[in-house]
Amino acid sequence: MNIIEIIELKKNKKKLSQDQINFCISGLVNKSIPDYQISALLMAIWFNGLDDNELYFLTKAMIDSGKIYKFHPEYKKILIDKHSTGGIGDKVSIALRPILVSFDLGVAKLSGRGLGFTGGTIDKLESINVNTDIDLKNSKKILNIANMFIVGQTNDIVPADKLLYALRDVTGTVDSLPLIAASILSKKFALESDYIFIDIKYGQGAFCHDIETAKKISNIMKNLAKKFKRKVYFVLSDMNEVLGNTVGNAIEVKEAIDFLKNNSDVGTYFKKLMFDLVTLILLKTKKCKTKKEAKEKINYVLENKIAFNNFCNWIELQNGNIAKIKNDTFFKPKYWTNIAAWKSGKISYKSIIELAEIGVDLGSGRRKKEDKIDFQAGIYLHAKSNEKIKIKDKILTLYSSKPIKQDLIDKAKKIIKIS
């Protein structure tokens, strides 16, 4: 087979066969095809797309490039996997799993790190010392005891995706919808769960800038899931606001734990999305018959600390700092500064991406993959867009392990509008 002929076919809007796609992915992984030729193919796909069959062939080839995590028949409970396309302040994955375990469900997840303004679940968990570098054997052991685990993506799970993404990242092909669908679902299908729930974010702080794009990608993934005969459900959620009151790592874990403890100090939209997602999962898995029943049962497991206890059991098995979690001392930044309202009025933020960039400047995110994260760095939002505030009311609190520079404070103030 000839890679140049395959590139020419896709360039001229022709369909690729399964053998041709397998040849390309195999050549990518074993390095028999140079990066520049795979990059040319990616650009041809960006311009001309993939039909349903081509996308199935690509996703299958990506899955087959590595190992598949299997838990049944040894594990008897329904196994859930939930994925988010990422957003600012998204700590849903941390809070969701302990609640689902309360309903006799198992929850497994392969997760990633953050780059830029979106924080990764792995970074957030490492802020409380959770070990996410766990192999399949130990993942099964933790699942059997705690009915949940979260681990980082390893080199033996869909290695083709890691290689493809690195090329997409430097060739302007990250935003190809078929390539996004293949990337997400290859990782989800490499873990053999019974149900997959995908939260597709849209808006300022998401890769889908509008709901129409979110609908397109969800439809592509729905068709792909049917070809694999997998149960996949989608939620489209607004990312024009920070999800919750916090942005960072340990500070986001704290808000997730506050939710599990049924404390009131959590963001309204975060709480609503949590209830919506858990309700959907309980209905689809037939753990509840109605939305009303689901809401009542969710409130019960929160009010009685059942979900929080599940969280603690799981964290302890993955070597998290359980003592600091139980006595609420894991988030203790050395430096902080408050930004207060200079007049009364209605607040708005110029851009939540710029707000998230302040968090990165404080140390909560990475500019480059090798950057070290300050787990104590972050932002607390005392006021959200369209809320009325009075003069001297706190708007933001900035946190860091290092002294916070005045130019960063000034930068944060410029994002705030009071009308």
Curated annotation (Swiss-Prot):
GO cellular component annotations, sorted alphabetically?
A: cytosol
Tell me the domain of life. Bacteria
| Assigned keywords, A-Z | Glycosyltransferase, Transferase
Record GO biological process: pyrimidine nucleobase metabolic process; pyrimidine nucleoside metabolic process
Would the keyword rRNA processing be found if you checked this record's keyword annotation?
no
Q: Which InterPro entries match?
A: Glycosyl_Trfase_fam3 (IPR000312), Glycosyl_Trfase_fam3_N_dom (IPR017459), Glycosyl_Trfase_fam3_N_dom_sf (IPR036320), Nuc_phospho_transferase (IPR035902), PYNP-like_C_sf (IPR036566), PYNP_C (IPR013102), Pyrmidine_PPas_bac/euk (IPR018090), Pyrmidine_PPase_CS (IPR017872)
What does the sequence similarity comment in the record state about its family? Belongs to the thymidine/pyrimidine-nucleoside phosphorylase family.
> What is its biological role?
The enzymes which catalyze the reversible phosphorolysis of pyrimidine nucleosides are involved in the degradation of these compounds and in their utilization as carbon and energy sources, or in the rescue of pyrimidine bases for nucleotide synthesis.
Report what the protein is called.
Answer: Thymidine phosphorylase
The species is Mycoplasmoides pirum
**This protein's encoding gene:** deoA
